[in-house]
Amino acid sequence: MSSGRIVQIIGAVIDVEFPRDSVPAVYDALKVESKGLTLEVQQQLGDGIVRCIAMGSSEGLSRNLEVTGTGAPVSVPVGNETLGRIMDVLGNPIDECGPIGEQERMPIHRKAPAYDELSSTTDLLETGVKVIDLVCPFAKGGKVGLFGGAGVGKTVNMMELINNIALEHSGLSVFAGVGERTREGNDFYHEMQESGVVNVENFKESKVAMVYGQMNEPPGNRLRVALTGLTMAEKFRDEGRDVLLFIDNIYRYTLAGTEVSALLGRMPSAVGYQPTLAEEMGVLQERITSTKTGSITSVQAVYVPADDLTDPSPATTFAHLDSTVVLSRDIAAKGIYPAIDPLDSTSRQLDPLVIGAEHYDVARGVQSVLQRYKELKDIIAILGMDELSEEDKQTVNRARKIERFLSQPFHVAEVFTGAPGKYVPLKDTIAGFKGLLAGDFDHLPEQAFYMVGTIDEAVEKAAKIAGKAA
């Protein structure tokens, strides 16, 4: 075990001098025993000096403090003992429920699986959310991104997906909270307890492991917490299980990288991001993959700064995903939730050979009606509905019904809306939209389609509205 001394401290970045014959490797963990702080080596500057980022607050550090090399990267607990527990970036428990008691620890830095170990699948993962299952279906073992600006519902959508998939799919989940609100992490933990996914009495019966590096943490924690969660998911995958990995929020991972990059003295690139943005994103995303042993299905929330999808951070993330769910402020402004844009959201699974001709035709039919309505909006704004042809009037009426039918009450939003949540099976979703496109429900009022589950509920709601009017 080599030991060195701190020679410089700039915020979260700390330079440590070691004897020249025992300089630690890049990504090695170093310990400041007197402060209980872990550092991670980022650069070797020469002359025995290494530049590190602190995995915690650097307050109270001073020059000449002794630092010990561990000779290995940061390692975290893995395996069944992590289930039901909340851990920080170093794998320490933060839920006040005693030690983890792990049998095994693994380093957070690993190589991605080799090309010949990868497996691809075209099995669909039903989410019970109509708009997702219809226009941007998820693949089992695929990667999904939830893109949206501030306050359009990324976290609520993710919570609903956790509720629907993690409860319906009896497998294991790992939740990594990267630079998000502590309050949301707390709410999530209590919701998981209420739904039985976390069993505090008997952790062995829990189905989710949680790793948090929240907004108030130093950039080193936020930068590495995604890797900590991923390492736990990889262990479950390598045991031959199907794992769900939820990351909220990938943008904060990029942002932590930007903060660290500037402190490490790198020249910034476009919009002030780190020059290694694509590489850092690739290192994380290439490890989130399914192998012939087991699968990782990941759902990642991606904050879009100033609603600009061309910003380098979301733009870099797009390349790695199988399905992109884009949340729109315009749709949220209409009161339609989930505020998912059916024209902007895409999926590689939307192919007749994968999902079948009927599903494909209905999805494309819905998109073409909504696209035509979008084109007609300018004409309607200037000349009004009366100037449209009969065919266009019919398209507009159907599009407005489809728009409303894409809304749905969520289980996790029940406390706010008072409306019980709905899980809609895929076959019911396809049947409902097929009927709308065929004109079977042209006689029903628009409001009957708002915030209902299946088409039968819309018909019931229309009857109630008609009864009240009478």
Curated annotation (Swiss-Prot):
Membrane topology per the entry is: Peripheral membrane protein
Q: What name goes with this protein? A: ATP synthase subunit beta
- What is the stated purpose of this protein? Produces ATP from ADP in the presence of a proton gradient across the membrane. The catalytic sites are hosted primarily by the beta subunits.
- Write down the Pfam families for this protein, in alphabetical order: ATP-synt_ab, ATP-synt_ab_N, ATP-synt_VA_C
Which GO molecular-function terms appear in the entry? Answer: ATP binding; ATP hydrolysis activity; proton-transporting ATP synthase activity, rotational mechanism
The subcellular location is: Cell inner membrane
The record's principal subcellular location, in a coarse class, is membrane
Outline the subunit composition: F-type ATPases have 2 components, CF(1) - the catalytic core - and CF(0) - the membrane proton channel. CF(1) has five subunits: alpha(3), beta(3), gamma(1), delta(1), epsilon(1). CF(0) has three main subunits: a(1), b(2) and c(9-12). The alpha and beta chains form an alternating ring which encloses part of the gamma chain. CF(1) is attached to CF(0) by a central stalk formed by the gamma and epsilon chains, while a peripheral stalk is formed by the delta and b chains.
Q: Which organism is it from?
A: Teredinibacter turnerae (strain ATCC 39867 / T7901)
